[in-house]
């Protein structure tokens, strides 16, 4: 009786916690007077994720398909890291890699340049070089086309069900789209790699390459994310990426780490001049208005004991049941049906 009761109580408690976590990920809790209102966000699409619990704290049109612009490069960098290619591998830049669409942001590569995978990754994430994206794609998969197939395959594996890529850099294309929720999934994979975190949080980096003629070339690039060096928030913001096209508007994903909190703020299609304020306002909302409670740790520090009436006289614990708890990490999202492009 004692063991059966303990198992039932534990299962009920675990089921309740798991069900709550899954529900929180896909819809906001009902409004209540004691839940502070979120800040006014100018962005058309947004999402705030607590990385410690994988809980969505705020969302705005998070499942509507839209253009991600250069935030696409988060997936590109992730696939380079997952490929296992050595960082000191030297790539010879092809004519095709530098033949990017007019108006692209570029690292400034020339055909025949020789440059390491590591420097290409910095050029991808800091300068947002479309030429660096294509050079990396060719290094990993042999061609941009094959790499794009890998991007879509990996997106499907991750459950990014409203995403389709047509290039490795995010230059505007009506067939190249994702959602705020899908990019949160991708970003969560990205930050699992220490190197990628280091790159995304770097304010600047010195690029070294060898030209086709054999001359050495060195130049310093700066991160397009101004929040990394912001006097007020620079100590808390660690990446990840900015993006802009006329179609996508102003986009940014930031990781906000402050006093034990770890948040991901995703902003898409924000009006000119509002992007960074939107990202920080959303992150601060999560930091100031929510807190994380570890129920498993609380139970470890102060156990709950239940007394069972009419227990067996042979029970060495005299009918005393100690309730224990274990926790399981919830999924960031449940599979979402395709949503139309707005």
What are these language model-derived features?
Residues 2-22:
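Sec-dependent N-terminal signal peptides of Gram-positive bacterial secreted proteins and lipoproteins
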């Amino acid at each position: 009786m004692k063991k059966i009761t303990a198992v039932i109580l534990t299962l009920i408690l675990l089921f309740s916690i798991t069900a709550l976590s899954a529900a929180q990920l896909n819809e906001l809790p009902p409004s209540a007077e004691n839940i502070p209102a979120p800040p006014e966000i100018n962005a058309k699409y947004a999402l705030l994720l607590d990385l410690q619990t994988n809980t969505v704290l705020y969302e705005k049109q998070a499942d509507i398909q839209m253009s991600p612009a250069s935030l696409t490069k988060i997936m590109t960098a992730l696939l380079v890291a997952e490929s296992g290619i050595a960082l000191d591998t030297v790539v010879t830049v092809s004519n095709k890699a530098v033949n990017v669409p007019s108006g692209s942001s570029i690292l400034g590569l020339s055909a025949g340049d020789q440059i390491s995978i590591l420097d290409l990754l910095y050029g991808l994430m800091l300068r947002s070089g479309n030429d660096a994206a294509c050079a990396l794609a060719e290094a990993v998969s042999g061609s941009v086309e094959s790499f794009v197939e890998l991007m879509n395959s990996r997106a499907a594996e991750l459950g990014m069900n409203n995403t389709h890529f047509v290039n490795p850099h995010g230059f505007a294309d009506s067939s190249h789209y994702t959602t705020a929720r899908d990019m949160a999934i991708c970003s969560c994979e990205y930050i699992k790699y220490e190197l990628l975190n280091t790159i995304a949080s770097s304010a600047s980096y010195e690029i070294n390459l060898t030209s086709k003629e054999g001359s050495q070339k060195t130049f310093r690039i700066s991160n397009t994310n101004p929040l990394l060096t912001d006097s007020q928030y620079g100590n808390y913001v660690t990446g990840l990426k900015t993006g802009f096209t006329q179609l996508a508007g102003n986009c940014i994903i930031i990781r906000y780490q402050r006093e034990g909190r770890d948040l991901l703020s995703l902003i898409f299609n924000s009006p000119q001049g509002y992007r960074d304020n939107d990202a920080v306002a959303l992150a601060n909302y999560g930091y100031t208005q929510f807190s994380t409670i570890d129920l498993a740790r609380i139970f470890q520090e102060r156990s709950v004991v239940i007394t069972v009436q009419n227990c067996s006289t042979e029970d060495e614990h005299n009918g005393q049941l100690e309730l224990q708890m274990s926790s399981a990490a919830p999924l960031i999202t449940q599979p979402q049906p395709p949503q139309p492009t707005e």
